[in-house]
Amino acid sequence: MSALTRRSFLERTGFLAAAGLLAQLPSVPWVRAATSLKPDLNHQTMSGLVAFIVPGPDAYSRKQGQTTKEPGGIAAGTTKALIDTLDLFIPSTPPLTTTVAAVLNGTAVQLDPGIVPGTFDSAFANLAFSQKAEVFRRLEAIDNPEAGALRFLAGNLPGLVAFLAYATPTGRKLSRYSGVADGRPEFKGYFHA
């Protein structure tokens, strides 16, 4: 029989606390709203987020008022990668993507109650660029101690989207990444006397 280490004790109590919290979640209104979201709404919300971070010539970028001639995050396939990454990060019911979409859309509706109906079913995807920035500002400014995970999510979600977008061939083309530096003429002989 193995000894109970401090680390394994903390892991087990953390899982127990999380299980207790998850058991109570179905009674929370935002969870009911999140689980009732259609997959299209999740996809639209994540696409609105992708266009916010890496705009392109797509419909989501046009709706927010920030476009580029070069292909953006939508063309790079970042929406699917983001949904897959979030849902694999913490396998849960509802999926993390659904929860993120509910939080972004809920904050968007608080910001502009008349935003839906719009071009998209997703309130967040219908926002202008500056309003999307305000959604993230509000989420990061929540001062409630219990909202630490929400602040963490809002603070790290843009970086995750950028990473996923620029880790693709389209992203490398956008950033003018020319490949690894090994073997370039300016480095040949640099480390030799």
Residue ranges and their predicted role:
Residues 7, 39-40:
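A general structural signal for short secondary-structure junctions and capping/turn motifs
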Residues 8, 14, 88, 123, ...:
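Intrinsic disorder/low-structure terminal segments
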Residues 21-22, 61:
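Short linear functional motifs in flexible/disordered or boundary regions
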Residues 31-33:
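Boundary at the C-terminal end of the N-terminal hydrophobic targeting segment
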Residues 37-38, 45-46, 50-166:
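Flexible, low-complexity segments enriched for small/polar residues
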Residues 170-193:
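Short, functional C-terminal segments
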